[in-house]
Design a protein with these regions (language model features):
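Extracellular/surface-associated beta-sandwich interaction domains
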Residues: 20-860
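Bacterial N-terminal signal peptides
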Residues: 6-16
Length: 860
């Protein structure tokens, strides 16, 4: 069945791709740009910024069927279906997609994008360019669509079911029916992030609209998923999947609470251990699990149906859990009890409102509870099979123009199986811990806890923690502060509120690091002829901005990086500053672990709590505990502490990151206009608050090399929610600079222009040291570089032969004092695009500051 419809789909996709071999990156076009007879432009895009690599399409299919191959339109490489972790050739999805069914007159119609047989594909996009997938990213501030971007990787696709041409939609030979459109349009938006807390899930947001002129009655929406989990090298991987539903788990982040998950999970049945040793092949084995989390459905209700089944050519093996009905159990086409093949059967399953038990429990006879008795091979099914499942929502009535929202998260989690665990310890053998954490973060990113998105005063559900050492418990809050329930009434010296659920209004926004500072560079050559680059920045916005989730200032520190190439993977940490604060570990007797329960404590807060001379450093592990007698309950409490980051908090050392104005107190006001008017001594000549002015001097640099320098900002994370510190990316704000005298110094001192290397030797092997360092794939002839330095910011360089012929003219035009404004290069190629020969050459540098003349030698 899979082979048949995949072959037809391959033909259709290749036909569309051949007709329109174009880039995916295009903005939305308001007026039609295609001809009526053009075919739909079927294409794909790859989510790969996080740890999941997953293919989405503009014809409704999520993933890539294992019987076919598709290729990334950007890279040309084979497209992954759902690899996790990416790069390890382990797949967790065959395909997924929407089912939409409705009653239209006397007909029951269902449109599907996946899970239909024999080459049927009923959703299609418009022709190119309207049908193309739009790409947006918060990483691209220069894109015209930056302001509307949601994540680091947004894909937007629009498709409809309006095409009824059987040559495109395919023909169902079993049911002998052609596609009959509902006339619906789906806008599919998918979002992914690369941050540590969000790189294990992808959000998919669907808007399903009735674009016909008729009402659609009793509409049901379903999400079909076929996982087929295993190594890509294993052609039989789809025969041993397991799946089930997980309602809730005990919270690991707020003691005493239960985390509501409501996920449908799927995994390989055993993680494919080595048959001899029983060990797993690390990330190259299917030891992870995946889940589908429903975040929003098209109604205020939160209920939905869950059905799973085995699809097989053998009708007797095609089976799924079914409830007994008064008129008997409905059998699907061919007497099947599993896979619904006709529109009527698909609609019946979506409307059944059944919620199946877990596949791993299929062997258990539930006939007394109203279910069909298990089949003869129930034990085999329980241990793994080719499973599909469907989540269904409805019914709804849709008038023309109405739209239904549906938002889901595809979540992955590691260590579902791991070495040292075995079937004898089932709960440890199949660990949901990673899925639990990643599901929570998907939920929080969708609807941010503590954020009043619609301005109605509701920020979601929360708990209040009492943080002072005399109290060690959680106060329960129900609905509003007026309904606070306390076990004991007392005053907390230090309190904190933790929101754990949003206000019900989608945000689609993740936690972000502090705003990165804008740096300015001031290069120079010192008296020892050593290059230096002074890096300056103002941290006002960085240090006063609040975190999206905690609504608190969570700035932790700065880091200085440098790179020779500018490559994202080539940046090296050279210096850092972070606040002096500590994580406090307390013992959880129920889990028998030491854990961090609160945000980091500053040294000032710790001394307020434990005495003005308190030093946490001697209490650094469970063998070196700090004992404190809590007089309120009359018992001893024990903690240990670890530095949160390095605690490099000395800002007076001029060899490290330091304050430009070390004696400047904290500002009297954070309003710049007010400060300039009433506190001018607190403001720099550039109009910035002096207190937040920093600098770092990079020393002993080679003036002949370019350096990429950057300053990042990072926060302290949220240890209680498993969120590690977030840091801005070094390469996103890097400045390319030479450790030479700046153009300002060159102009003020009328410095002599210098050319290097002089002489330039073709056999000098400069490429090994600095030539072509930024373009290593280019030929040597095109990466040669003769350097000019001590240039004014705006001038004209002309190169002449010894006979006075003009060889090359170079226009040098930079803003005054801009990075690199003192420097330029020539690739030894003439104005006629010819490589020059050996000889003596003259040059002139003309600017408003005068004209300089010099010469250099080229030796072949």
């Amino acid at each position: 069945m899979k082979i048949a419809y995949c072959l037809l789909l391959v033909f259709l996709l290749f036909a569309a791709a051949i007709c329109f071999p174009r880039s995916l990156y295009n903005s939305e076009i308001n007026s039609p740009q295609y001809n009526i007879g053009d075919p739909p432009y079927a294409t794909i895009a790859i989510h790969n910024i996080g740890r999941i690599a997953m293919t989405i399409s503009n014809y409704g299919v999520i993933g890539v069927n294992p019987m076919m191959k598709l290729y990334d339109p950007i890279t040309g490489e084979e497209a992954p279906s759902m690899n996790y972790p990416k790069g390890y050739s382990v797949d967790f999805l065959a395909e997924a997609g929407l089912w939409v069914g409705a009653i239209v007159g006397r007909d029951t119609l269902v449109t599907t994008s996946a899970g239909s047989a024999w080459g049927v594909r009923e959703f299609w996009p418009l022709p190119y360019p309207e049908g193309d997938i739009r790409h947006r990213s918060t990483n691209d501030p220069y894109s015209p669509e930056f302001d509307s971007s949601v994540s680091q990787q947004d894909f937007i696709a629009i498709y409809t079911d309006t095409i009824d041409d059987v040559d495109i939609t395919g023909y169902d030979y079993d049911t002998q029916r052609i596609h009959r459109p509902l006339n619906i349009q789906v806008t599919q938006r998918s979002y992914s992030w690369g941050y540590d807390y969000a790189d294990d899930f992808i959000l998919l947001d669907f808007e399903i609209a009735n674009i016909s002129l008729r009402d659609l009655q009793d509409v049901y929406v379903g999400l079909y998923v076929d996982n087929d989990i295993g190594k890509l090298s294993n052609p039989y991987r789809f025969f041993d999947d397991i799946c089930g539903f997980r309602k809730a788990m005990r919270s690991k982040y707020i003691a005493g609470l239960i985390d509501t998950l409501d996920i449908v999970w799927a995994a390989d049945n055993d993680g494919d251990p080595d048959p001899i040793s029983g060990a797993y092949a690390g990330l190259f084995a299917p030891t992870s699990a995946v889940a589908t989390k429903v975040l929003r459905i098209p109604t205020d209700r939160t209920d939905f149906a869950f059905n799973w089944w085995i699809s097989s050519w053998d009708e007797s093996y095609d089976w799924g859990p079914r409830r007994n009905q008064p008129g008997g159990v409905r059998q699907f086409l061919g007497g099947r009890l599993g896979h619904p093949m006709t529109d009527e059967d698909k609609y019946y399953m979506m409307a059944s409102k059944e919620f199946d038990y877990n596949q791993t429990e299929a062997y258990y006879d539930r006939s007394a509870e109203g279910w069909l008795s298990p089949p003869a091979n129930a034990a085999e099914i329980s241990s793994g099979a080719d499973i599909k499942y469907l989540l269904s929502f409805g019914p709804f009535d849709m008038n023309p123009g109405d739209a239904l929202p549906l938002t889901v998260a595809f979540v992955a989690g590691q260590d579902f199986y791991s070495d040292g665990m075995g079937p004898g310890k089932v709960r440890k053998w199949r660990s949901f811990d990673s899925l639990q954490l990643n599901t929570l973060w998907a939920t929080w990113v969708f609807d941010n806890p503590g954020v009043d998105s619609d301005g109605d005063g509701n920020r979601g559900k929360y708990h209040i923690f009492c943080l002072n050492p005399k109290i060690s418990r959680i106060d329960t809050i129900i609905n509003s502060p007026a309904d606070t329930i306390f076990d004991t009434v007392f005053t907390c010296l230090y309190g904190d509120t933790m929101f754990y659920q949003g206000d019900g209004v989608p945000d689609f926004r993740g936690a972000l690091p502090p705003e990165r500072p804008e740096i300015k560079t001031f290069p120079r050559v010192n008296e020892f002829n050593e290059g230096e680059i002074v890096i300056k920045w103002n941290g006002f916005k960085t240090e006063t901005g609040t975190d999206q989730f905690s609504q608190k200032i969570d700035f932790e520190g700065y880091r200085v990086y440098t790179s020779r190439s500018g490559n994202p993977t080539d940046f090296t940490l050279v210096n850092s500053y972070d606040m002096q604060n500590y994580d406090r570990f307390a013992y959880d007797a129920s889990q028998k672990i030491w854990e961090v329960r609160n945000l980091p404590y500053s040294i000032g807060v710790l001394r307020d709590m434990y005495g003005e001379n308190f030093d946490p450093d001697p209490y650094f592990d469970e063998d070196h505990l700090f004992a404190y007698y809590n007089s309120w309950p009359g018992k001893w409490e024990f903690y240990y502490f670890s530095r949160h980051d390095w605690n490099r908090s000395d800002l007076s050392d001029t060899m490290s990151i330091h304050k430009v104005y070390p004696d400047q107190p904290y500002p009297s006001t954070l309003n710049l206009d007010t400060a300039m008017m009433f506190y001018p001594d607190e403001v720099t000549p550039e109009g910035q608050l002096k207190y937040f002015e920093y600098e770092y001097v990079m020393r002993k640099l080679l003036p002949s090399f370019p350096y990429y320098v950057t300053v990042t900002a990072f926060d302290h994370g949220v240890p209680t929610a498993g969120l590690r510190p977030l840091e801005t990316r070094p390469y996103e704000s890097a400045v390319r600079e030479f450790a030479q005298n700046s153009s300002i110094l060159a102009e003020e001192r009328n410095l002599k222009v210098v050319v290097y290397p002089n002489p330039y030797r073709i056999d000098g092997n400069y490429r090994e040291f600095y030539e072509g360092w930024e373009d290593p794939k280019m030929s040597a002839e095109r990466t040669r570089a003769l350097h000019f330095t001590n240039l004014p910011h705006k001038c004209t360089i002309r190169v002449f032969s010894i006979d006075g012929d003009l060889i090359r003219e170079i226009g040098h035009d930079f803003p005054a004092g801009a990075p690199g404004s003192m420097h330029d290069t020539w690739n030894l190629v003439s104005r006629n695009d010819m490589t020059i020969t050996s000889g003596i050459y003259y040059y002139t540098v003309e600017s408003e500051f005068g004209t300089q003349v010099g010469k250099f030698v080229v030796i072949y």
